[in-house]
């Protein structure tokens, strides 16, 4: 516990009136050789009513003199013991250090407070467990170059230690020490200085790295693949957007090529691309544009590349389309469409490739982005035999109502030029028909139209099945009308198989008495009808 005197000394800031030397000595507020000692504020002292010092500076002075009484007083005033130890080292007061040794803790914590290399080394010696390597590492951390110079020969004998100290100096960014090690000692690997320079975007460290690299190249016989190293540095600098680093590398023989600018594009550093784009061949710019699409570069970067090509990309259209589809990068398509002059429409080409190779989700996204009609996509899907797409896009566009779906798909079949595509749409229509509940009297008109549609497109088997279904609805008069109209279609379009099916139904209806001889003769009186049917059966039955 504190004594009453200590409590008074600790908490009295301003003395009530000037006290005599004897009273001050009794209070412990007298510093031999200096005079009265008074606390001012939280961290200063007044000496002999005249001089003001920080408490820690006063501690250093007291430690240097070995005045333990003043040290104890200043510690009561919340001074830092480390300054007393520094002063004791300066005055070689090891007896004072011994008294406080257990309170010091880690001596390394005192080192940042020391400016004098000799005191620095003496302080480090207080720690019995440390060796020369520990001293040298702390010398690097705290910029004590003279200590390193003092132990130069010892460092030189240990190549591994040299490398360790060099790398530590790089991480601590101690340029003077790095330069000294680089010129005075042998460094096996220089990579660390560049790694740290890139990590902290420290240009001065990067320049120093090249200074040491060129010194090493010119003075040592070691083989260094300088072109590869320069290229690597350029790519790294481009990826980090460090133009000044790139310019420094170029001074030493670096060359900006496609891989370097690709790194700038990938990490969205347009200013670097803009700085060098006019220094590379046109062929390289085209490759960079393709890569920019792949990397989904922003609008400004794409426009920069397109502008340098005068928006003339016809020779790489196929590759552009490929990259747009593979990497889902459609911005280039929009930019080319926005041009008033030299406009290039890649929508159809991209859409065709999407329909052929991509997923339903990708296609729908593209349709939404470029306002593509479902009819357009369904026709493409039919040409590529992608039944699933036809079904999914149809339902997404027109709902899941069978009659609506069939109506729209029939319209597409009428305008479809590709026969295989038309057949697939008809197949889809029939699939919808078979999986719906249309075979009811209420759907008679729709089934009638569907049968005529099949007849118009020579869909023989589907026509036959729908006719059978339609007959099952028991609408004799309408069935006869359907059969006769379909016969006319078959004759006009030269569909013999449809005509044969109709002829079979005509005979059936005649035997049932649902159609007269006159109606048959009238229907079969069409031009060229005799090439499709033989009326001898009718004459034979009449007689």
Swiss-Prot record:
Any one Pfam family match given in the protein's UniProt record, by short name: DUF249
Induction / repression: Expressed in the early phase of the viral replicative cycle.
Record's keyword terms, sorted: Early protein
Cited InterPro entries: MGF_505
Family: Belongs to the asfivirus MGF 505 family.
Function: Plays a role in virus cell tropism, and may be required for efficient virus replication in macrophages.
Name of the protein in question: Protein MGF 505-10R
